[in-house]
Amino acid sequence: MAEYFLDNPQIKHPDIYIAFTPDEEVGGGMDHFDVKRFGAKYAYTVDGGGIGELEYENFNAASAVIELTGQSVHPGEAKDKMVNASRLAIEFDAQIPENERPEYTSGYEGFYHLTDMQGSVEHAVLKYILRDHDRDLFEKKKDIIKKAAESINMEYGEGTASYVIKDQYYNMKEKLEDAMFLIEDAKNAMEEL
């Protein structure tokens, strides 16, 4: 598009600003993007979708990393002393709603996706991605992670489970609700092609 307008200066158009950002899938590419300096009030993202595809909403997204600390004791003397972090990881994951995992959801249904699990008796780490189109349900998913960690700590002692939840990006529809003309303009332009 930029090349076309540069090659055809006789075609009238409003000011056009173009930016390239990396790391779109996790939203990190925009962390240091100076929106004010960029100068555009609104922007479209051109991505690798199919011809005629127009999307204006997406998941709210967060990552969650849970660390579990166990207590290793010789197996012959472990009764009432050993705390197996790998088993704590299993116990933690069992508190996540079973029907809210990617293999059981579709469309607008949000999910908890366990992407990585590593563990030993002394230490275990679970990594999840949390997704939901609805902001309230997204916040509830983060609360369930927190409550699962708190439950482990209540049972096995403070500091047994720790978590870091990091918001990655939000549903862009929230920002567009007062500017739906942008979607209509894009639809009209696509239909004219």
Tell what function each PLM region has.
Residues 1-2, 44-65, 139-159:
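Short N-terminal signal/transit or membrane-insertion segments
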Residues 24-27, 70-77, 167-172:
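Active-site-proximal beta-alpha loop/turn segments in soluble metabolic enzymes
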Residues 30-31, 79, 139-142:
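Conserved strand-to-helix beginnings and helix N-cap segments that scaffold or border functional pockets
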Residues 15-21, 67, 162-165:
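Glycine- and acidic-rich phosphate- and metal-coordinating loops
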